[in-house]
Amino acid sequence: MTLEMVAARAGVGRQTVSNAINSPELLRPQTLERVRHAIDELGYRPHRAAQALKTRASRLIGYGIRSSSTRVPTPVLDQFLHSLSEAADRAGYRVVLFAVAPGDDELTSYQQLLDEHGADGFVLSGTDRGDRRQGWLHERGVPFVAFGRTWSGKDVGDWVDVDGAAGTSAAVRHLAGLGHRRIGFLGWPKGSGVGDDRARGWQSAMRELGLPTRGRRVASPDDPEQATEAAEKLLATGVTAVVAASDTLALGWYQALRRAGRGPGPEAAVIGFDDSPIAPLLFPSLSSLAQPLDAVGRACMRLLLDRLRDRDRPTEHILLEPELVLRESV
């Protein structure tokens, strides 16, 4: 049941039905009575979202937590959410975390937060190919911003992302500047937006520098043991340096070298991605690409606030570059 159906039954416009629910004092008594009769006749139950999204009375921003997120490590999410929550608090909003049902029920979780709490908007993360959330929210006129690009389909909605390709390209160029010519890439299986983006940066930099790529890209899930097996394949090709799509994958290079009686360093360099809390604690300490998560959180909140103020403004996309943090592993 929708506002449009009530409007058709009452013979009025959609805005008139919205006014009857949110601001009845704006309507003539006869019109208000006609709309209320249609509501009763159809059994329409106004969602709190119909009121909250109009008045922003709830001042709540929803953030759905998926049961598993293999592409967004927990330390990354923790720092991002801290920055996002601080920015929301300064603007007078609260970020509400809610569990997202897996599979086909995922969107139901978003609908429930709209129905039960009237969230003003949503912040998404962990976007990937086939992600239905952006299109679903866009079709319903619900304000949202994503930490992550729209990797497939129509590019809808505002987003902030980190330029993974720029990061891995910078890593390759740094390693090449140290004299490495056989530089491998330890990434995730093909098909992930974030993973393919990071692989693309490695490949483009290698080609621009005239360095061979054939046989020097291996894939593994974000699991240390499987990453070790993949890293051993790279080691067998004679590479002298590796760029990894995550710090977890970089751990596989550490372990593969240790099994071979060696260790990371100038002769077997590695650069990870995410600059997780474990990176400086490893021995030798891990060089890594740090995402500007504080800036991402602030930018996400700014875009969402702008969208709440003006639903019709052009979409805005912000792409930030990671920082190469050098340590002992190179």
Q: Where do the language-model regions lie?
A:
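Residues at secondary-structure transition points
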Residues: 1, 26, 30, 48, ...
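Short beta-strand segments enriched in small/hydrophobic residues
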Residues: 16, 56-70, 174, 182-188
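Amphipathic helical "hinge" segments at domain boundaries
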Residues: 44-109, 203
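Active-site-adjacent beta->alpha loops and helix N-cap segments on the catalytic face
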Residues: 131-138
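Short beta->alpha connector loops
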Residues: 101-104, 125-130, 248
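Bacterial carbohydrate/catabolite-sensing allosteric modules
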Residues: 41, 86-91, 138-146, 151-330
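Short acidic/polar active-site loop segments enriched in Thr and Asp
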Residues: 13, 59, 120, 181-183, ...
